[in-house]
Curated annotation (Swiss-Prot):
Organism: Clarias gariepinus
Record-annotated membrane-spanning stretches: none
Annotated compartments: Secreted
Listed name of the protein: Gonadotropin subunit beta-2
UniProt entry tagged with the keyword Transmembrane: no
Signal peptide: 1-21
Domain of life (superkingdom): Eukaryota
Main location: secreted
Example of a GO biological process term: positive regulation of androgen secretion
Similarity field: Belongs to the glycoprotein hormones subunit beta family.
Function: Involved in gametogenesis and steroidogenesis.
Amino acid sequence: MPASSYFLLFFFMNFFSPAQSYLLTHCEPVNETVSVEKDGCPKCLAFQTSICSGHCFTKEPVYKSPFSSIYQHVCTYRDVRYETIRLPDCRPGVDPHVTYPVALSCECSLCTMDTSDCTIESLNPDFCMTQKEFILDY
């Protein structure tokens, strides 16, 4: 292969890959429909809130050593406010209140199990196992 072909290949790999990454949404708060449900409450409540979503730049090493850890950054909460919602028709003795985080700002950092779903594939945020009710203006 001629040297000019290597140059062109290198040029296109480095020129177009970063350009395409600008098309991805950066990590930021977005409005999303989420659902909450609880044992002892027959209905699932769906409502709009702010969650963290978007792309974080990461580097995957070509050689993975069994002696080194790989830490991938994910889009997660930086600043949150907590709000409480009341589930309808809960059985007597069941606390109908559920507290959830509202994203005020987001960052690319390690996944924190306290505030984020750190699984590879998870359910959609509006998934319900019981009958769903919507709150339109919350």
